């Protein structure tokens, strides 16, 4: 008798998408994704696993009317381990119990001027199963997106991007101060706000390049 188990993904910690305008309606789309390299599986999309298999990192670009304009895959550039927070008071007891890896992806696309602009969307399931303030986090996916404004807003634009990585762990009961600053190549003023993370796909369908349901994740108090 052969028994099969669905290859679920329980690894996503976070991510961001940003872009640079190259001229001639060409944009370099960049994405960083973070995974738990202790409690989570599988490896990053776009990179080979231990058997040489590669799951493509699909993304889709939509116009403001939800029409898919480009469906493609990111080029996997590099991945590395995020250094731990060595100056944390609980670092000696936490060392070896926390591990986060960062993957970098890029893709150059041509996007003609379009009123309203475009949305670049990447979806993947699932989030880290150790999350405490989500119901069944190991079956909750993630959606990351970036908006490229249309010509009625600006003729050419580069998006902001975060400057510092957040610490991979914080100490229970100890306040944290972290400078989550971003920079903008155009020198634009930046406004920061907190929002609900977006859900995306589930354990039954962990990866697909279709119209993404950008819905906030269901939360519970803890």
Label each residue range with its predicted role.
Residues 7-222:
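Long, compositionally biased, intrinsically disordered segments
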């Amino acid at each position: 008798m052969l028994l099969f188990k669905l290859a679920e993904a329980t690894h996503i910690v976070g991510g961001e998408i940003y872009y640079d305008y190259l001229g001639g309606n060409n944009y370099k789309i960049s994405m960083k994704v973070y995974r738990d390299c202790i409690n989570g599986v599988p490896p990053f999309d776009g990179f080979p696993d231990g058997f040489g298999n590669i799951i493509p990192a699909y993304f889709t670009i939509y116009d403001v009317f939800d029409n898919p304009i480009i469906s493609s895959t990111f080029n996997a550039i590099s991945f590395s381990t995020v250094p731990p927070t060595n100056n944390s008071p609980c670092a000696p007891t936490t060392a070896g119990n926390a591990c986060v890896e960062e993957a970098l992806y890029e893709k150059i696309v041509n996007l003609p001027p379009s009123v309203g602009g475009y949305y670049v969307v990447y979806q993947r399931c699932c989030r880290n199963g150790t999350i405490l303030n989500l119901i069944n986090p190991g079956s909750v996916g993630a959606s990351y997106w970036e908006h490229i404004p249309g010509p009625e807003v600006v003729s050419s634009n580069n998006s902001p991007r975060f400057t510092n990585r957040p610490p991979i762990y914080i100490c229970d009961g100890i306040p944290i101060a972290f400078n989550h600053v971003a920079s903008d190549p155009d020198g634009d003023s930046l406004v920061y706000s907190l929002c609900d993370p977006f859900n995306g796909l589930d354990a039954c369908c962990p990866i697909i390049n279709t119209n993404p349901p950008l819905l906030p994740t269901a939360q519970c108090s803890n």
